[in-house]
UniProtKB/Swiss-Prot annotation:
Family, as annotated: Belongs to the glutaredoxin family.
Keyword tags: Cytoplasm, Disulfide bond, Electron transport, Redox-active center, Transport
Species of provenance: Dictyostelium discoideum (Social amoeba)
One Pfam family in the UniProt entry: Glutaredoxin
Gene name of the record: grxA
Biological process according to GO: cell redox homeostasis; cellular response to oxidative stress; culmination involved in sorocarp development; response to oxidative stress
Predominant localisation class: cytoplasm
GO cellular component, one term: cytoplasm
Function, as annotated: Has a glutathione-disulfide oxidoreductase activity in the presence of NADPH and glutathione reductase. Reduces low molecular weight disulfides and proteins. Affects the culmination and cell fate decision by modulating the levels of reduced glutathione.
Disulfide linkage: C21-C24
Name this protein carries in UniProt: Glutaredoxin
PANTHER family: GLUTAREDOXIN 2 (PTHR45694), GLUTAREDOXIN-1-RELATED (PTHR45694:SF18)
Compartment list: Cytoplasm
A single MF term (Gene Ontology): glutathione disulfide oxidoreductase activity
Length: 100
């Protein structure tokens, strides 16, 4: 859990993801379209990926991926992140974090 907390603290925008997950790909594509480069942890490529996913899940309350954190706050997975964007609420969060 300490490693995940340290990663979340060190990166203003971090996504816990898996390379083959379509929802993960969608949320990464959204940030790409916004010209924002998140720090991405591909859990399926990490030797301790299962432990990292469990720890991230304890912090977020969600076990599934993707898990998106902005400024150390869990904002949700793909659906929640996409919804925030469609409501005009994602851009201000990214601006606050210094991305736009």
């Amino acid at each position: 859990m300490d490693k995940v907390k340290a990663l979340i603290k060190a990166h203003k925008l971090i996504i816990f993801s898996k390379t083959t997950c379509p929802y993960c790909i969608s949320v990464k594509d959204l940030f790409k379209k916004l010209k924002v480069v998140p720090f991405v942890v591909e859990l399926d490529l990490e030797s301790d990926g299962s432990e990292l996913q469990s720890a991230a899940g304890q912090i977020s309350g969600v076990r599934t991926v993707p898990q998106v954190f902005i400024n150390e706050k869990f904002i949700g997975g793909c659906d929640a992140t996409t919804k925030l964007h469609s409501q005009g609420k994602l851009i201000p969060l990214l601006q606050e974090a210094g991305f736009l």
